[in-house]
Structures are given as structure tokens and as C-alpha cells.
Amino acid sequence: MASLQTPVMVGTVVGCVAGVVGFLAMSSNAATSLSVAPASTSTQIIANPSVIAPQYQGSVTSEDVAMEASQTDFAEVAEISSPVQVQSWSMIFSAMLAVPLAAAAMFFMKKSTTEERRPLVSIDDLLSVGKKAVVASAVVGAAAGSANAYPIFAQQAYGNPREATGRIVCANCHLASKPTEIEVPQAVLPDQVFEAVTKVPFSGPSGFFNVVDPSTVVGSVTFAGTQPVGFIQESGVPVSQALVDIATPGTPDTVFKATIKVPYDESLKQVAGNGRAAPLNVGAVLILPEGFRLAPPERIPEKMKEEINGLQFIQYSKDTPNILVVGPVPGKKYAEMTVALLSPDPRVDKKAEFGTLPIYVGGNRGRGQLYPTGEKSNNNIYNVEHSGKIADIQLNEKKRIYTVAVQQKDGEIINEDLPAGAELIVKVGDVVEAGQAISTNPNVGGFGQAESEIVLQNPGRVQAFLFFSFTVLATQTLLVVKKKQYEQVQLSEMNF
């Protein structure tokens, strides 16, 4: 029987260590946090509604934001138990060690010689399988990262996501406008769970980068999971989603739920921060009336827990339990998001009040066009900065970046680098003017907001109304009976 040589044994041991380290990198990411912002983030909060792109200072830089975007935009890998996950030091060191250990294992294995005699199981086959396993474990371990939530940008810059003008601040970075709808029960009782349906239809053509010409207007095709739902068409083009029926509210002593639906065409892809095509993320912000909040876990029925599907909404801040955010989360898994809510009892909570109350909702799909620092993301049309003739176009395939050389009238050539993933609509020899768009619009997402009303009924008023209705009914019944008696008396007197 063939004996394994020393390099092979060393390579095997190192490969096993790499696999264990890769596994640790994955398992160390299991811990989650519901904190508003990571403890390592230092931010000076500026909440000025008049500023379109909020500027804040601290450890969060544009490079950090770009790096975060490139990691987060791949929504399908975000198999998370809560929207916000915090990286641990053990995960970082494990991920850093996994790849070099795998490389060392392959180096030792490469030094092994081929044995002529083969046992029942070929050593070459074992080495081939071992190499593949080592590489796979190292790659998985190094790629294991957390899914950071974009709402943290708004949480750091604004104390309240709804400005004095009524606009939700998500629109500061998500510049494209998309429709959003919400349906809520007409009325609920105190200490009751109800259902609100928010629909965020998606519009855009299909394709690898889903390029959208600025002048093209397309309709909205909506999906619930993988099944298309009803929509309204105009000249054969779907333009809006039809209303979806919702269930009636539960009994007065139960928790109610809010179901936020974000349907969109799952074949659409967005441009990630690194220029690659990635699935779309979805997110939402729900601004409830004062006193409304997330339902306690012990009040949530088992059936509703199944509908929630492990998704956890978080408070916008510790002082605003009535404002909830979620996302970005994978659209394929969370095309329909359910959250359990609890209505307040104004007799106990003095901040709450009976009557007709407003509910505001904002929903987005895809990435934004601006970072919180005010810088543009690569999810934009690129406008050339200089006038002249395009002398040369170079493509960095690794970074997916085009470099366009513009020759000005004086002969000077200026190179302009386009954002990663941009698709050119010009060619060498074209004459361009400063500010002219030279790339397609890669944005297939957008943000929309809507509002509705809900009535928090006073049980005393309901009881009084029922008592009044019963009294009126009884009075009318007695009057009819008395009238019959009077008629009988009249008939008896006429007989005499």
C-alpha cells in the first residue's frame, strides 16, 4: 500500500486547519445585535431637513460607505436572523487566516510525488478532493460577512425620519420615485394586533444590468414571492398594482400584524458597489401613531411567528418605539414582510389618544444614488465633466471601470474614470459637451412613500353606542307592541 509522503501529510494537516478556521469564521458571525449603530461608529448627528444630502462627521467615510455597499448589495447571501449584524474580531481574524492556510496546504500538496502503486482509493483522487475542500472552506470562511443595514445612515443623521415637510428622509439618497401603497384596517381597539399591507411595486426592464434610458417610462409588474399578482394596464403596459384584499382584524384581546409587501420582478438585477450584477434588496420604514409598538414575543401567536419568518424589525431609535425600520433584506426571501404590532391603551399610556390617527410608510427597492456624505454612488448616470472629442476608451475588466480620454480644443487630453459597472453609450470619435450623459442609467430601484389613517376606538364609546342602539331598538319594539295593544282596545270598544 502506498504511503503518504511528508509534504502530503503536512498539506493535509494544514488543509484541515484551514477548514476549521473557515468554519469558525462562519460560526462567529451568528451573533446578532439590535443596536441602532455599531459601537465602533463615532458620529456627529446633524438633523437639518433642508439639507438634501446630510453631511455628518466621524469615523464613517465615503470609502467605508463604498466598501459597505460593495459587500451588502449581494442580498441573496444575507441569510440573517435580524437585519443588523455586527462583525466580531474572531470572525475577522478567522477569515484572514483561512486563505493563507489554504494556500500553504496546496503548496505542500504540490510537492508530493505520484505513487505508481494505487490502493483501493487513489491518493491522487484524495489529493484532488482535498484541494477542492480546502479552497472551498477557505473561500467560504473569508467571504463570511455580516449584512449591514442601510437605515443606519438615516438613524445617524436624523432624529426623526419624517421631515417637517412630510418627506421621509430615505428620499435624500434614493432619488428615483417609485409608488408605495399601504392598507390598514379602518379601526382597531386598544391592546389589539391589526394588519397593515404596504405595497412597493417595482418597475424596470429585465437584463444583465437592466439599463434604463432616462427618457423611457415603463410600467410596474408586481410579484408576490414568485407568483405575479393583479395589476392595472394602460395601452397594454402595466402601470400600477391592483388592491389586494386583506384579512379582517383579530379579536380585541389579540396582537395585530402589519404585512409589508414589496413585490418586484425577481429577474431584475442591480449594479452592486463593485460593479457586478446583484439581486435587489428591499427595505421599509413604518411610522406608527404615538403609542403603537412592536408586539411582545409572548403575545405573538405561533401562526404569526411562521409568517414573520425570522425577520426582525428594529426601532428607529431607543426613544421612538413607534418608528420601525427593516432592511436591506433579500427581496427573494422577504418579498412579503410581516411584523407583529400592538395598539396602545390611552387609559394607561397617556401619550396615546383615541381617534383617527395617521400612519406613514416608506419603501425602497435597490440601492440609492447618493451616500450620506453627499457623494454619488455608482448607481447613477455618468455625466462627462469636460467638453471635447473622445480620443480613447479603456476598460479595466478586473475593476469593471471605463477610462474615457477626452481631447479638448487646445489638444490637452483629460482622462475621466467612470463608476464601476457603468455601460457607455458613446464611442471613440464622438464629440461631447460638459455635463452630457455618456453612460446608461443602471438604476432599477427607487423609493416611494404613502400614508393612511387608522381609528383607535374607545371601548367606552363602542359600548355606549351598542347600549344606545339596544335602547332605540327596545323602544321601537315597545312602541310597536303598545300600538298593537291600543288597536286591540279600539276594536273592542267598537264592538260594544
From Swiss-Prot:
Record's bilayer topology term: Single-pass membrane protein
Keyword Metal-binding in record: yes
Chief subcellular location: plastid
Positions of heme binding: 150, 170, 173-174
Short name of any one Pfam family annotated for the protein: Apocytochr_F_N
Cellular-component GO terms for this entry: chloroplast; chloroplast thylakoid membrane; photosystem I; photosystem II
Known cofactor(s): heme
Entry's transmembrane regions: 462-481
Lineage top rank: taxon: Eukaryota
Keyword hit for Metal-binding: yes
Cofactor remark: Binds 1 heme group covalently.
Transit peptide feature range: 1-149
UniProt cross-references to PROSITE patterns, sorted A to Z: CYTF
InterPro entries: Cyt-f_TM, Cyt_f, Cyt_f_lg_dom, Cyt_f_lg_dom_sf, Rudment_hybrid_motif
One of the GO BP terms on file: photosynthesis
Cell compartments where the protein resides: Plastid, Chloroplast thylakoid membrane
GO molecular function, one term: heme binding
Keywords noted in UniProt: Chloroplast, Electron transport, Heme, Iron, Membrane, Metal-binding, Photosynthesis, Photosystem I, Photosystem II, Plastid, Thylakoid, Transit peptide, Transmembrane, Transmembrane helix, Transport
Record's miscellaneous remark: This polypeptide is nuclear encoded in Euglena gracilis, but is chloroplast encoded in other plant species.
Function (record text): Translocates protons across the thylakoid membrane and transfers electrons from photosystem II to photosystem I. It receives electrons from the Rieske iron-sulfur protein and passes them to plastocyanin.
PANTHER family: CYTOCHROME F, PTHR33288
Quaternary structure and partners: Interacts with plastocyanin and Rieske iron-sulfur protein.
Similarity comment: family membership: Belongs to the cytochrome f family.
Protein name: Cytochrome f, chloroplastic
Organism: Euglena gracilis
